UniProtKB/Swiss-Prot annotation:
It is an enzyme of class 6 (ligase). This is Cysteine--tRNA ligase. Zn(2+) binds at residues 29, 213, 238, 242. Belongs to the class-I aminoacyl-tRNA synthetase family. One of its GO terms (cellular component) is cytosol. Coiled coil: none annotated. A motif ('KMSKS' region) lies at residues 270-274. Its cofactor is Zn(2+).
Length: 458
């Protein structure tokens, strides 16, 4: 196949072919469910939703795993603050995650494992690492990974052990052999709730964050699989540590190809909960429709930083309306996409070059221009079909164009009827007043031989 993907591990674009012919196995790091998802999470979920959609469009079967971290220091802290159990908090946040993802048109992954369901697999991997001399139990009861015992550490991030400033990056804890060593199993603390403690050969405790993804990835996709993805902030240390754990345990390459999506920035800083500069998906959806938010994300390349502002979202909304306006001119005909021809070939070439959504979106606008000129049902059908591979343009055009108007449908139709009555009575001043009043409320009237229709102003 002709698909090329940027591999963070090799720092190069690589021709992609799955390890198992015709079947792609992909793991993407998901949410830590202690709070509502913010727009940065949406960016990652949308990016890899587009990836899996295009892999399927390319004729490949896809097993897509996106995990849920449902045990973590932040989760414990929030549950204690709220006076609720870990399970109550995480169940509630997972429900909210699903509602937000569904609203944004993000397809469900094949598997969505909760970390707490895979503790036995984590303990097995920790035992294997300890048996190979790659892990040790410290005096405080924690089991740590001995980073300097794994020769390949740093190959994903491009950092050598000598270059890493452990004092800045890793909290030095009692019992570590080296400041860079990281925890695989955290021993239980007396003050911690009972529902965050598991029995183990190492004593009561809970898994570290990094071992969770290694164990779930191997359990669901095998010891070696095709693609591992996540946000750029996970490249180091999380993904670096996953490689050390998984390859240390199995002796095999973990993921063949590593993909990382860029940040969403606010005032040139990464949007994050820790910085307090984040907007939840729900906050944004109070102001903008879900497809506009998705389009805002998709029209930038997944590896590029994306700057959040109302101006950029307003522009995304106006641009998306131009595409829907073209689709409103003629009913799209069902089409069988010929990927070797014209617009479809250009769209495919864009997507086959590291999921080049900006170029693919440019093809959609060129095709919309063709629809505007030709009023061709086939061209409109192709526009809708190509947009669907990005999770776009599947709504009813009239419904989309009317969305966001200040009045409800019945009130607008009453005004249109009153204007028609005024025009019939040759009271053109009153007809113009009604048109202008509606325009002031963001509603544009369009007269034609078949009557008057309306849409929200751009």
């Amino acid at each position: 196949m002709s698909l090329r993907i940027y591999n963070t591990l090799s720092r190069a674009l690589e021709e992609f072919s799955p390890l198992e012919p015709g079947h792609v196995r992909m793991y993407v790091c998901g949410m830590t469910v202690y709070d509502l998802c913010h727009l940065g999470h949406a960016r990652s979920m949308i990016a890899f939703d587009v990836v899996q959609r295009w892999l399927r469009a390319s004729g490949l079967a896809v097993t897509y795993v996106r995990n849920i971290t449902d045990i973590d220091d932040k989760i414990i802290k929030r549950a204690v603050e709220n006076g609720e159990t870990i399970r109550s908090l995480t169940d509630r946040m997972i429900d909210a995650l699903h509602q937000d993802a569904d609203a944004l048109g993000i397809e469900r992954p094949t598997h969505e494992p909760r970390a707490t369901a895979y503790v036995p697999q984590m303990l097995d991997m920790i035992g294997t690492l300890q048996g190979k001399g790659l892990a040790y139990q410290a005096g405080n009861g924690d089991v740590n990974y001995a980073v300097r015992k794994f020769p390949g550490y740093g190959k994903l991030s491009g950092k050598s052990l000598d270059e890493l400033n452990a004092g800045e990056r890793v909290a030095v804890q009692d019992g570590k052999h080296d400041p860079l060593d990281f925890v695989l199993w955290k021993s239980a603390k007396p003050e911690e709730p009972a529902d965050v403690k598991w029995r183990s050969p190492f004593g009561e405790g809970r898994p570290g964050w990094h071992i969770e993804c290694s164990a779930m990835g191997c359990a669901l996709l095998g010891e070696s699989f095709d693609i591992h993805g996540g946000g750029a902030d996970l490249q180091f240390p999380h993904h670096e540590n996953e490689i050390a754990q998984s390859e240390g345990a199995t002796g095999k390459p973990f993921a063949r190809l590593w993909m990382h999506n860029g940040f969403i920035n606010v005032d040139n800083e990464k949007m994050s909960k820790s910085l307090g500069n984040f907007f939840t998906i729900r906050d944004v959806l109070k102001e903008y429709d879900a497809e506009t938010v998705r389009f805002f994300v998709v029209r930038s390349h997944y590896r590029s930083p994306l700057n959040y502002s109302n101006v950029h979202l307003d522009d995304a909304r106006a641009a998306l309306k131009r595409l829907y306006t073209a689709l409103s001119l003629v009913a799209p005909a069902p089409v069988e996409v010929d990927w070797a021809e014209g617009y479809a070939a250009r769209f495919k070439a864009a997507m086959d070059e590291d999921f080049g959504t900006p170029e693919a979106v440019a093809v959609l606008f060129d095709l919309a221009g063709e629809v505007n000129r030709s009023k061709s049902p086939a061209a409109a059908g192709l526009l809708k079909a190509l947009g669907g591979h990005l999770g776009l343009l599947q709504a009813d055009p009239q419904d989309f164009l009317k969305a966001g108007a200040g009045l409800d449908e019945a009130a607008i139709q009453a005004q249109i009827a009153a204007r028609a009555t005024a025009k019939a009575a040759k009271n053109f001043a009153e007809a113009d007043r009604i048109r202008n009043d509606l325009l002031a409320q963001g509603i544009v009237l369009k007269d034609s031989a078949s009557g008057t229709t309306w849409e929200a102003a751009q």
